[in-house]
Amino acid sequence: MINAQDIKNGTCIRMDGKLYFCIEFLHVKPGKGNTFMRTKLKDVVSGYVLERRFNIGEKLEDVRVERRPYQFLYKEGEDYIFMNQETFDQHPIAHDLINGVDFLLEGAVLDVVSDASTETVLYADMPIKVQMKVTYTEPGMKGDTATNTLKPATVESGATVRVPLFISEGETIEIDTRDGSYVGRVKA
């Protein structure tokens, strides 16, 4: 248990049977009345962000979480099999717990966040940017660079990304895994 005044960014708490990460906090001391903490909490499972006020003396249940590197090995049914890079144990992780799963390649290393007391996986984070080779895209026409037009391109993971017209097959591009958007071309 922690006091509400001890909440900081990244603190994980259990409230109403759900786990929340603090993503923003503010210690408020009004001229009149009691001091309180104004927080923004992100639901670990759904990603829903809510604002919540806590009185300074209020007790909260904190949850200790661990972030460890895991390597993706293969897909088995709906589960993805990962290997803990420290203990070499293999663990299945459900599809919906992996952020940016469309850009997952064999051998990729992800940060897996789990509850330290129960060892249950909360979620797995892809790196924010990944580099992938374009496996298929329509050829661009010469002189089609006047406008900021995008075309679909398939990358090596099988995902489709909208890219500028000058990108051709075989080129390596950088992709933002949060929204699947094109970031730039990677120089060889």
Curated annotation (Swiss-Prot):
- Subcellular location, record wording: Cytoplasm
Q: Which SUPFAM superfamilies match?
A: Nucleic acid-binding proteins (SSF50249), Translation proteins SH3-like domain (SSF50104)
Domain of life where this protein originates: Bacteria
Q: Which GO terms describe its cellular component?
A: cytoplasm
Lyase recorded as keyword: no
Pathway the protein acts in: Protein biosynthesis; polypeptide chain elongation
InterPro entries documented for this protein: Elong-fact-P_C, NA-bd_OB-fold, Rib_uL2_dom2, Transl_elong_fac_P/YeiP, Transl_elong_KOW-like, Transl_elong_P/YeiP_cen, Transl_elong_P/YeiP_CS, Transl_elongation_fac_P
GO MF, one annotated term: translation elongation factor activity
Keyword Protein biosynthesis in annotation: yes
Record keywords, A-Z? Cytoplasm, Elongation factor, Protein biosynthesis
The GO annotation for biological process reads: peptide biosynthetic process
Q: A Pfam family for this UniProt protein?
A: EFP
Q: Which family does it belong to?
A: Belongs to the elongation factor P family.
Which HAMAP family does the record associate with it? Answer: EF_P
What is the role of the protein in this entry?
A: Involved in peptide bond synthesis. Stimulates efficient translation and peptide-bond synthesis on native or reconstituted 70S ribosomes in vitro. Probably functions indirectly by altering the affinity of the ribosome for aminoacyl-tRNA, thus increasing their reactivity as acceptors for peptidyl transferase.
This protein's name: Elongation factor P
Please report the organism this UniProt entry assigns to the protein: Bacteroides thetaiotaomicron (strain ATCC 29148 / DSM 2079 / JCM 5827 / CCUG 10774 / NCTC 10582 / VPI-5482 / E50)
Give the source lineage, highest ranks first: Bacteria, Pseudomonadati, Bacteroidota, Bacteroidia, Bacteroidales
